Amino acid sequence: MNMKTNTATQLLLAACAGVLSCPGAWGSTTVCQDQSYYLKTACPHPLSLAGPTADRVYLRFQTGWASKYECEGLDLWDGSLCMFVPEIQYKEWVGKIWYGVSTDHRNHAELKYRLDYIKELGNWTVMPWYEHSFVFPGDKGIPRPGLKTTYHFSDRWFGGTDLYWQYNNHTFRGYYAVFAGLHEEIADCVRVDAVVRYGYNGGYVGPVVHHGSNALDYNLSFTFRATSRLTVELFTNYSQALTVVKQRDLGDDFYYGINLKYTF
C-alpha cells in the first residue's frame, strides 16, 4: 500500500464532505454546486428543483456512482463510490439521508443525516445547513454545521462561498471555499454546468494535511430531463492539488460519475 493510500485512509475518519460529494455538495454535482438556482427553460419539465414557495411536500430519491470518493481534494477511499439519498422538501426546508458505500472495499461506508434551509434574498441564495456523519466501521459520529451563499449575477453566471466546520476532539475545525460558474441550457431539457472551486483547509482536513490551500476543482456536468419525474446527470471533475496537499504527494485526481434523481 503506497503513501497516498495510507494517508487517505487516515484522513477518512478525520474529514469527509461529495456528489456530489463534500458537505456542501448535496446539490447536483460533486463540486458543491448550489441546489436552489432556477433555470428559465423552454423544457416542459424544468430542470431545477421546485421553488421553495411551492406549498407542497416534495419527495425525491437519488442514486449515483462515482469513480472516486473525492473530498477537499483527496481521494478518501482509493476506490469507487455508490450512493443512495432519500430526500424530502417543504418550502425552504430540505432533509436528506445520504448513504455511501465503497464498491472496492467492503469495510468502507458512510451515513449522513442532513438538513438545509434555503432562502432567496434578491440575487442572493443563502443556505445554512447541518449534517451529522458516521463513517463505518467504528465512528461515533461527527457534527458539521455550514453556511453556503451564492450570488446570481444573471440567469447564467453565479459565484459564492462555502464555509463549513466539524466538531472533533473538542474543537471546531473549518474548511473555506469560494466558487464561480455558469449554467446554460444547450438544448430542450438539457443543461450544462461548469464550476471552478478553490478550497482552503483551516484544520478540517487533518492531522496529516496542514493549514493552507488544499485544492482547485474544475467540474463539468450535463443534466438531462428524461421524463417529468426523472433527471440524469453525467459529471466529470479534476481536482488540482495545491500547496498543503501537494506537499504530501496527494491530490491531482480525475474522476467521473452518474446521478439519477426521481421525484415522486
PLM region spans:
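Cleavable N-terminal export/targeting peptides
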Residues: M1-Y58
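Outer-membrane beta-barrel "beta-signal"
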Residues: V31, S36-L39, S221-R225, G251-F264
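Structural signature of outer-membrane beta-barrel channels/translocons
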Residues: P52, E87-K91, D116-G122, T150-R156, ...
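Residues that define the transmembrane beta-barrel architecture of outer-membrane proteins
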Residues: D55-V57, W77-C82, N107-L111, W124, ...
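Repeated loop/turn-to-beta-strand initiation elements of outer-membrane beta-barrel proteins
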Residues: L59, E92-I97, G122-P128, D155-T161, ...
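Transmembrane beta-strands of outer-membrane beta-barrel pores
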Residues: T63-C71, Y90-E92, Y99-T103, K119-L121, ...
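Membrane-embedded beta-strands of outer-membrane beta-barrel proteins
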Residues: F84-P86, Y113-L115, P128, P145-L147, ...
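Detector for outer-membrane/organellar transmembrane beta-barrel domains
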Residues: I142-V209, S213-N214, L220
